Amino acid sequence: MDDIVMNGSPEVPPPQPPPEPVERPPTPPPPPPEESVAPPPPPEVVAPPPPPEDLPPAPPPPEPKKKKVGWGAKKPAATPLSVEELVRKKREADAAAARPKFLSRAERERIALEKRAKEVEAERRLKASNGVDRSATQSPSVSSEVNHSDGRTIPTGPRAMRSSDTPTAPAAMRNSHSHNKNRDLSPPPPPKSMSFGLASSKGDKRPVDDDEVAAQVALVKQRYMGADQTSTFSAKKKRKRTTDRKFNFEWNAEEDTSGDYNPLYQHRHEANFFGRGRLAGFGDDVADNVAKKYARALEDRDHEAGGIRAREILEMERRRREESTRNQLDKHWSEKKLEHMRERDWRIFKEDFNISTKGGSVPNPMRSWDESGLPKRLMELVNKVGYKEPTPIQRAAIPIAMQSRDLIGVAVTGSGKTASFLLPLLVYIAELPRIDEFEWRKNDGPYAIVLAPTRELAQQIEIEAKKFTEPLGFNVVSIVGGHSFEEQAYSLRNGAEIIIATPGRLVDCIERRMLVLSQCCYVIMDEADRMIDLGFEEPVNKILDALPVSNEKPDSEEAENSMAMSQHIGTKDRYRQTMMYTATMPTAVERIARKYLRRPAIVTIGSAGEAVDTVEQRVEFIAGEDKRKKRLGDILSSGEFRPPIIVFVNIKRNCDAIAREIKQWGFSSVTLHGSKTQEQREAALASVRNGQTDVLVATDLAGRGIDVPDVSLVINFNMATTIESYTHRIGRTGRAGKSGVAITFLGNEDTDVMYDLKQMIMKSSISRLPEELRKHEAAQSKPTRGFAKKNDDNSAFGSKGGW
């Protein structure tokens, strides 16, 4: 019974003892198996508990505690099992089991390894149990043959029936092999099972090496944790490959002692060069030291002649150093001298000020007023007027105009175009004889004419020009509508070097023989696109055709030669110079430029037709006059914007109505439109400029060229009919580098300009495009239409002369 318990459980029968051999008289019975050879171990099965009689005696029960006996003793209350408590605990256990538990990478690896180890152990046990089963189910004859001491098998039948195993070697080798096995007393291998003549290795066990275990672990990690995404690339390793073929000595460089005893290493030779010679890789400090050392050597050798030569060498080194630093990139263009500026510096300079030029032989812009090339007397007036830094159009246009080149300037409103053509004009006429020198010279007309689209712009240019002409002794006269011809003829009695006029009134004066242009050699067209929009193309052509042709420039490459164009024709006259300034370039303006300008240089500041970057554009969709008036009152009463404020409308009769509404709200207002006389216009502008009036209500008449300082807000009560008019309306604010706001009221009648308005607002960095305009159907594509009809106020100013 003890043997049964120790060797295995009752469920698995222990190996049976070998049966007795068959009784044959001639063959002696086989000896019994040796006890030293142990049978194969049974599978690891949990042993059953021993029978009750074999168990040790149980320990004595503990002595019961003395309980209180008597009337004070309490009976223990029976506590029934709480079903709710069990259900609650079960739910908590289920919830805890269902809740995902975070496992770190190390824990996941450990769990995977443990799981794999268990699988390997189970597989090993399964193989061991299969081997035991096969050994237990062997026939008694085979078992007796294997366990025989001398290894000789006892024949149990014919040889054909006894050779159940497939021979794997010659008989001699098989006998010696089995003999050695029996001599080592190792357990016999289990018999191989035959399956279709092929040996199966299911029951065989082979030793597993460490490399295979590591490979299996790596596969498990890759299966459960994914492939390793960490890159093993190393730039250092890649660089180290180049040193594989480098020969390394057995000693270090620190062990070199040749410098201690060899004088060649103690006194190294210094390379001395004469003149501009330099050693490759030496810096300027080393070159300076070499030059100074050589100069001292020359001076020590010959104090008189060597000193002169030493100073020449030092001066030569200084010039060489300046020449070398000229091409360095370490300084900004503002820190360099003019002669040290390179092409790259000029390109950066133009990008900083958003300047682009076209045309042959265009000079570089000026960085400051000191580089403008203006005469000293004119520079003093520039400083006196208060021009501190030139604007971008002034930086680019003045150097070109000073070379007697024809010029087309494309710039936004309020960019300082007036000074950019006035200053070169004064330099030009200063080289001509004085107009009051002879009586006949007074009657031949002015030296220069300046054309402006509106009276207000012409008078504004006149005020700006007199700041320079009066100290220089030049006479400036403005010829505009609204004044009598007799008054203007009286102004011309003493002659004038410069005449500033509107095209219509100037044509009237020419046709009335009040004025001739026999000696006019300088023509300026300011706001040329606006003049074309107002229908002044024909008057402009008449004026330009009335100019003399004797001093006209040739239409060839010679017109780009500044030296040839600056020379006098004959003894007194000079080549005619024509300048055109505009904000946009419509087809009609290009047609005039091709006809009357000779090889012009084109200067563009920013992009043509874009709004000023200093103006914040706001758009509000408001339908109906009453709602717009209410919104206008809210804006003016908010106190957010300081006067002066300009309100633009499209129809003249709306000006007075809106002005009356503004006065009822407690603000002072004036109107400016074509029905006003010249005196009324001048008085209205003067009141706004002086700060006496808060709000100016105007039509597009004031949309171009009117410079009212410090306008904080422009309100488009009615949207302009064209995007060009809108651009010049909002250009009344944000001038001279200051910021401003433009608010536009939109309605369904403005669908023709919604697309262009959307594009302009999108290009502005400080403006926000409203969602309603962005999604509006009319703003999705450019409308295909003809020329917009002009308002009555745009085509004429309402006065009798028409201009």
From Swiss-Prot:
Compartments, as annotated in UniProt: Cytoplasm; Nucleus
Biased amino acid composition, Polar residues: 135-146
Alphabetical keyword list: ATP-binding, Cytoplasm, Helicase, Hydrolase, mRNA processing, mRNA splicing, Nucleotide-binding, Nucleus
Enzyme class (EC, first level): hydrolase
BP term (GO), one: mRNA processing
Keyword ATP-binding among record annotations: yes
Residues annotated as domain Helicase C-terminal: 614-777
Positions with a binding annotation for ATP: A411, V412, T413, G414, S415, G416, K417, T418
Domain Helicase ATP-binding: 398-603
Motif DEAD box: chain residues: 526-529
Catalytic activity reported: ATP + H2O = ADP + phosphate + H(+)
Residue ranges with Basic and acidic residues bias: 115-126
GO cellular component: cytoplasm; nucleus
Motif Q motif: where in chain: 367-395
Biased composition (Pro residues): 11-62
GO molecular function, a single term: ATP binding
Region span, Disordered: 1-83, 115-210, 773-803
Coiled coil: none
Pfam families the UniProt entry points to: DDX23, DEAD, Helicase_C
Keyword Oxidoreductase assigned: no
E.C. designation(s): 3.6.4.13
Described purpose of this protein according to its UniProt entry: ATP-dependent RNA helicase involved in mRNA splicing. May destabilize the U1/5'-splice site duplex to permit an effective competition for the 5'-splice site by the U6 snRNA, resulting in the switch between U1 and U6 at the 5'-splice site. May also act to unwind the U4/U6 base-pairing interaction in the U4/U6/U5 snRNP, facilitating the first covalent step of splicing.
Binding partners and assembly: Component of the U5 snRNP complex.
Family named by the database record: Belongs to the DEAD box helicase family. DDX23/PRP28 subfamily.
Record comment regarding domains: The Q motif is unique to and characteristic of the DEAD box family of RNA helicases and controls ATP binding and hydrolysis.
Protein name: Pre-mRNA-splicing ATP-dependent RNA helicase prp28
Species this chain originates from: Aspergillus oryzae (strain ATCC 42149 / RIB 40)
